[in-house]
Amino acid sequence: MQLNSTEISQLIKERIAQFEVFNQSYNEGTIISVNDGIIKIYGLSDVMLGEMILLPDNEYAIALNIERDTIGAVVMGPYIHITEGTKVRCTGKILEVPVGVALLGRIVNALGFPIDGKGSIEHDIYLPVEADAPGVIERESINEPIQTGYKAIDAMVPIGRGQRELIIGDRQTGKTALAIDTIINQKKINLPCVYVAIGQKLSTIINVVKKLDEHDALLNTIVVVASASEAASLQYLAPYSGCAMGEYFRDRGKDALIVYDDLSKHAVAYRQISLLLRRPPGREAFPGDVFYLHSRLLERASRVSKEHVKNVTKGKITGKTGSLTALPIIETQSGDVSAFVPTNVISITDGQIFLESNLFNSGIRPAVNAGISVSRVGSAAQTKIIKKLSSGIRTALAQYHELAAFSQFASDLDQTTRKQLIYGQKITELLKQKQYRPMSISEQGLMFFIAENNFLDDISVENIIQFEKEILTYAYNYHLDLMEEINKDGNFNDIIKKKFIELINNFKNS
């Protein structure tokens, strides 16, 4: 078959018409230095602060310093294979992490990837790790409690849903134990929890996960891990990732709880990154924006209005308010709460629970210092029975500590003073509680009623704990309906008062 010149030219024209040119442009730059996980990039333009930068092998860095000619970025993960001269690209995206119900019961890293060996997580929703806190109009007042299960805290330092309550104290004073017990106590009401481990040993994190699993609380918890062996960039990122995961529940009309363990190590990781980025150091070598580091994180914990939930879900969920309650943990050195990071976080949060080494070592656990522990908004959220019956506990303890200090110098004490000292000792003993043994509202209510109405007068200090154990067993065996009724609505009235008196008298006569 022979083709003439006309047919050949026609074929060429058709091919030219069908030819498509793919014109794809990239915002590309070159790495000019690599230093302890910090890369300097030359040649990138129009970079956003916090933008993801694509590195070889599908790894990412985040732009934190934007200078005239160069970009300072922190690598999210290992950086040994990254060399000078490597080409990198802008993505035009701010870092996002996967969120949703599918993450409950899983252990993930700061980027949201599973690290528990249970396979991949099916999710289709991503949220940015950095988000604006809800405005004043979008918020609701706090009027519902988060029960920690600890008598000392639910009575004296109550926590409301949407509150930020700091747990502060020296190492080995029970800070993590308190937070873990609070998570365990939420399993009864299926309240989603997020536990963020920052800069901790892997052995410690494994123990925490094991305890959550043993008490059936892991299925309701997302564990976000940035251990001490991981890059400072991932330790810096972890709390923001965990917060985004918690906000998913808040913005869908649910209540959620998040624990940051701990923000002292978070501040140290940020200090390391800032110094490597050549930012000017300030007090204790922390950068000038270390307050903003924690304020923008903790302000995202809030109780949001029905309108906010409706707007975020585009009308799919209506008539529901949501909340995210934050329990940040700060470790102090020798009880110094006036250090830079502790004072910052105290001023940001809505109160603090101060755990003291001396109390812990003397066997008072939880080692709550009632004098400087405070909840600024939680009292409005207390259940009626706890609010009514625990009002005199803090006063009694304050008087006891004052008299105990005075009695060391006085040789003889009058009858009234002796009585107050013994009552204070009994209250101190009553507030002691073992780990992983959170108490329900009805159990706390009954014990506070006994203390408030002088039913402890004929019981010695040594027998308080045994008495508590026996009367609670008796209450569940013979007055189960009463205990369940109180757990359900948290009310206290004359009928319940009469039933409590009857229960106590029957127990003492048995």
Curated annotation (Swiss-Prot):
<comment type="function">
    <text>Produces ATP from ADP in the presence of a proton gradient across the membrane. The alpha chain is a regulatory subunit.</text>
</comment>
<dbReference type="InterPro" id="IPR000194">
    <property type="entry name" value="ATPase_F1/V1/A1_a/bsu_nucl-bd"/>
</dbReference>
<dbReference type="InterPro" id="IPR027417">
    <property type="entry name" value="P-loop_NTPase"/>
</dbReference>
<keyword id="KW-0066">ATP synthesis</keyword>
<dbReference type="Pfam" id="PF00306">
    <property type="entry name" value="ATP-synt_ab_C"/>
</dbReference>
<keyword id="KW-1003">Cell membrane</keyword>
<dbReference type="GO" id="GO:0005886">
    <property type="term" value="C:plasma membrane"/>
</dbReference>
<feature type="binding site">
    <location>
        <begin position="169"/>
        <end position="176"/>
    </location>
    <ligand>
        <name>ATP</name>
    </ligand>
</feature>
<dbReference type="InterPro" id="IPR033732">
    <property type="entry name" value="ATP_synth_F1_a_nt-bd_dom"/>
</dbReference>
<dbReference type="InterPro" id="IPR020003">
    <property type="entry name" value="ATPase_a/bsu_AS"/>
</dbReference>
<dbReference type="GO" id="GO:0045259">
    <property type="term" value="C:proton-transporting ATP synthase complex"/>
</dbReference>
<dbReference type="GO" id="GO:0005524">
    <property type="term" value="F:ATP binding"/>
</dbReference>
<dbReference type="InterPro" id="IPR004100">
    <property type="entry name" value="ATPase_F1/V1/A1_a/bsu_N"/>
</dbReference>
<keyword id="KW-0375">Hydrogen ion transport</keyword>
<keyword id="KW-0067">ATP-binding</keyword>
<dbReference type="InterPro" id="IPR000793">
    <property type="entry name" value="ATP_synth_asu_C"/>
</dbReference>
<protein>
    <recommendedName>
        <fullName>ATP synthase subunit alpha</fullName>
        <ecNumber>7.1.2.2</ecNumber>
    </recommendedName>
</protein>
<keyword id="KW-0813">Transport</keyword>
<keyword id="KW-0472">Membrane</keyword>
<comment type="subunit">
    <text>F-type ATPases have 2 components, CF(1) - the catalytic core - and CF(0) - the membrane proton channel. CF(1) has five subunits: alpha(3), beta(3), gamma(1), delta(1), epsilon(1). CF(0) has three main subunits: a(1), b(2) and c(9-12). The alpha and beta chains form an alternating ring which encloses part of the gamma chain. CF(1) is attached to CF(0) by a central stalk formed by the gamma and epsilon chains, while a peripheral stalk is formed by the delta and b chains.</text>
</comment>
<dbReference type="GO" id="GO:0046933">
    <property type="term" value="F:proton-transporting ATP synthase activity, rotational mechanism"/>
</dbReference>
<dbReference type="InterPro" id="IPR038376">
    <property type="entry name" value="ATP_synth_asu_C_sf"/>
</dbReference>
<dbReference type="GO" id="GO:0043531">
    <property type="term" value="F:ADP binding"/>
</dbReference>
<keyword id="KW-0139">CF(1)</keyword>
<dbReference type="Pfam" id="PF02874">
    <property type="entry name" value="ATP-synt_ab_N"/>
</dbReference>
<feature type="site" description="Required for activity">
    <location>
        <position position="373"/>
    </location>
</feature>
<dbReference type="InterPro" id="IPR036121">
    <property type="entry name" value="ATPase_F1/V1/A1_a/bsu_N_sf"/>
</dbReference>
<keyword id="KW-0406">Ion transport</keyword>
<keyword id="KW-0547">Nucleotide-binding</keyword>
<keyword id="KW-1278">Translocase</keyword>
<comment type="similarity">
    <text>Belongs to the ATPase alpha/beta chains family.</text>
</comment>
<dbReference type="InterPro" id="IPR023366">
    <property type="entry name" value="ATP_synth_asu-like_sf"/>
</dbReference>
<dbReference type="Pfam" id="PF00006">
    <property type="entry name" value="ATP-synt_ab"/>
</dbReference>
<dbReference type="InterPro" id="IPR005294">
    <property type="entry name" value="ATP_synth_F1_asu"/>
</dbReference>
